[in-house]
Amino acid sequence: MSAIAIIDFGSQFTQLIARQVRGMGVYCEIFPSNISFETISKFNGFILSGGPQSVNDDCSETSRVVHEIIKLNEATSVPILGICYGQQLICHYFGAKVKESFKQEFGRTKIKILKESPIVKDTWDVNSEVDVLMNHADSVDTIPQGFTVIASGVINQTIAMIVNEQRKIYCTQFHPEVKPTTNGSKLLSNFLDIANCKRDWTMKSFIEEQKEKIKNVVGEKKVIAAVSGGVDSSVAAALTHKAIGKQLNCIFIDTGLLRKNQTIAMLKEIPINYVDKSNLFLSRLKGITDPEEKRKIIGNTFIEVFEEEAKKIGDVDFLMQGTIYSDVVESGHASDNTSTIKSHHNVGGLPEKMNLKLVEPLRYLFKDEVRLLGKEIGLSDEIIFQHPFPGPGLAVRIISEVDKEKVQILQEVDEIYINTMKNYDLYDKIWQAFAVLLPIKTVGVMGDGRTYGYVCALRAVTSSDGMTADAFPFEDKDQHLLVFWDFLRNVGSIIVNNVPGVNRVVYDITSKPPATIEWE
């Protein structure tokens, strides 16, 4: 089976490279930058990710793996693709000058294609201007010997893409793995062709591989699982159950922070124990306003409850979680070099000395892959295609302190928002939609009286993997916008007229980046 090694230097987008490669039917693995060369020496090609460092700083460990990969390339012509910091590392190795950019570039920009190359075959035409995503403070200032400039920045004349065709080394300052880059996936596909990769990796093969891994790790021991009714925990539970059957014990904990009338979607043949701990969670959140502290309290309490329930079951050694890769990336656990954006319920806030070992069968899958997996193992569309819901629940959608009254207000708003969205046939067009209760009150008028109520923010985004997202709607189609505008006016009116305590509704139009999808 063909395989690509992705060397992770700490980019927030590294996992998107893997998602793109796997989506093209090629197996790939992600390795930290301190990986031993023996581990990666047999791969068909190498992709060097971006990262937050500068090649002008001390990076001896980083340089080691790059030097070894380039030496392998010299001996075997194994293809290399360097992205952003990866480009800078390659250029630095060959003696080119990399310096801090006169004007740093973060976000969408345009590049101009200057020459043809196999890496841009059927991707972009020569002399065309292309939208790409840049995310760099440093840039390449001189061209290494043997390399040719294929593209440059339209505004800043950044060296955007260089190649050494003889050595099969390709470098981009921009990020082809991120959707704002037009046709970036085709560039990656061209690299896989250059590396002679067969497109033979499938979700079915991943499922069989994970089942075997779960069996080998767990053996004959019992596993306790957190299930919330959401996509991730449901798919993880179903996959684990297929691997070990009755050894899996699923528990649904009511934290008091769920959607109104939220119930666990039926998972056939998997028994589920229900535990109400809403008073415990709400009491521990009293007086807490910092979002990270909320997450850690919820994470600690969650594990504490599971440990208590595990004792009741007896002889439990493992805790299964529905952690997916976007959780890991945003928490800074994918690489030692990755900056933490925010901790996630499934990967942050865990006690340092946890009495249960972790089983995370979805840890290296993105949301769209999780849905494909769920479909493959026979879960219903009701489970698979529901919108994501955060592990900490409404606690991270109530800005500032959480209490029972605020939870009830937000539950009412959320129910109206989602149900009205479904009535407008918009729900399935949107990746994630939710309401946020803000920590401010504003003056309003209802009837002949003055009101002083909460402001509620509505959010709806489109995405495929949760790593980047656009506010919905993102297309300038008049009819599309008119329908959504009518929906917003209608749902805002319904909310303020039916939810006591709320007198103003606003809509969040921010994309990711620079914002995250959730507010906290």
Curated annotation (Swiss-Prot):
Enzyme category, top tier: ligase
Record-annotated GMPS ATP-PPase domain positions: 201-386
Record keyword ATP-binding present: yes
Disulphide bridges: none
Residues that, per the record, bind ATP: S228, G229, G230, V231, D232, S233, S234
Active site location: C84, H175, E177
The protein's annotated pathway: Purine metabolism; GMP biosynthesis; GMP from XMP (L-Gln route): step 1/1
Boundaries of every Glutamine amidotransferase type-1 domain copy: 3-200
GO terms for cellular component: cytosol
One Pfam family recorded for the sequence: NAD_synthase
Gene Ontology MF annotations: ATP binding; GMP synthase activity
Residues spanning the signal sequence: none
EC number of the protein: 6.3.5.2
Reaction catalyzed: XMP + L-glutamine + ATP + H2O = GMP + L-glutamate + AMP + diphosphate + 2 H(+)
Assigned keywords, A-Z: ATP-binding, Glutamine amidotransferase, GMP biosynthesis, Ligase, Nucleotide-binding, Purine biosynthesis
CDD domains in the record: GATase1_GMP_Synthase, GMP_synthase_C
Keyword Nucleotide-binding in record: yes
Protein purpose: Catalyzes the synthesis of GMP from XMP.
Summary of subunit composition and partner proteins: Homodimer.
Name of the protein this chain belongs to: GMP synthase [glutamine-hydrolyzing]
Classification lineage: Bacteria, Pseudomonadati, Pseudomonadota, Alphaproteobacteria, Rickettsiales
Gene (UniProt): guaA
